[in-house]
A protein has these predicted regions:
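Conserved alpha-helix/loop element of class I SAM-dependent methyltransferases that forms part
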Residues: 37-47
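S-adenosylmethionine/decaboxylated-SAM
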Residues: 4-29, 46, 51-226
Length: 226
């Protein structure tokens, strides 16, 4: 039997209704806009084969959201959800762009570090979500290993939220051809973080692709694979 989680990162189960009220009292409208955007994008893939794969899990918000949408619209066995992340401190070694390094410093000062893999795994078990892989480590090492273990992998939705240039480029170039026709590449950082934005622009130009957005918010942007 799984031991219930009563508190995590200073938040307590006993105050859950206060947190929900506080969200609606104080959060910016953009938080609801993004939730609706994610819902609409997930709805578009329910008749497509392929897994949902996210890069940049952080504290698990969007991954849990996708798992909840899967539970509402499909089942755990409809598709796997995979989350890649360092699961801790934002990796900054080897970043060539000063703007990317500055962004990471500002982001961590404001938002702190992401959840550890074990912490997020416990949350997912608590919520009853199955068929989810959490892959921890440097994406330049973990993604090739994961693909070697699952050469059949195809994606219905690729969610990129890594902020900076080098890993965004690596994942796009490695996984785009595994996205099924009609599948989505969803980019959280386009026109908000310089590194990821420049990489996406280069990729669109090289591949002759079109970037789209939904009407209710400026992010995420997305590509529909022809």
């Amino acid at each position: 039997m799984t031991t219930p989680i009563n508190s995590l990162r200073g938040l307590s189960r006993d105050s859950v209704w206060d947190y929900e009220n506080g969200f609606y009292w104080f959060s910016d409208q953009s938080r609801i806009n993004k939730l609706l955007a994610h819902y609409e994008l997930y709805r578009r893939i329910v008749d497509l084969p392929g897994d949902v794969v996210e890069f940049g899990v952080f504290k698990g918000l969007s991954l849990i959201r996708f798992a909840q949408f899967r539970a509402l619209m499909e089942t755990d066995q409809s598709r796997r959800i995979v989350g890649f992340d360092a699961f801790g401190k934002f990796p900054s070694e080897g970043l060539a762009r000063a703007a990317d390094r500055d962004f990471i410093a500002r982001f961590e000062a404001a938002a702190g570090h992401g959840l550890a893999r074990d912490e997020l795994g416990a949350v997912l078990r608590e919520k009853g979500f199955g068929n989810i892989d959490l892959v921890a480590g440097d994406v330049f090492e973990t993604l090739p290993r994961y693909l070697a273990s699952r050469p059949e992998l195809r994606l219905s939705l690729l969610h990129l939220d890594m902020d900076v240039a080098e890993p965004t480029r690596f994942v796009l170039e490695t996984l785009y051809d595994r996205v099924v026709p009609g599948g989505l590449v969803v980019i959280d950082d386009y026109a908000t973080v310089a590194g990821a934005t420049d990489v996406v622009d280069d990729f669109l130009r090289d591949r002759g692709l079109q970037l789209r957005k939904l009407p209710n918010y400026r992010t995420p942007a997305f590509i529909v694979r022809p």
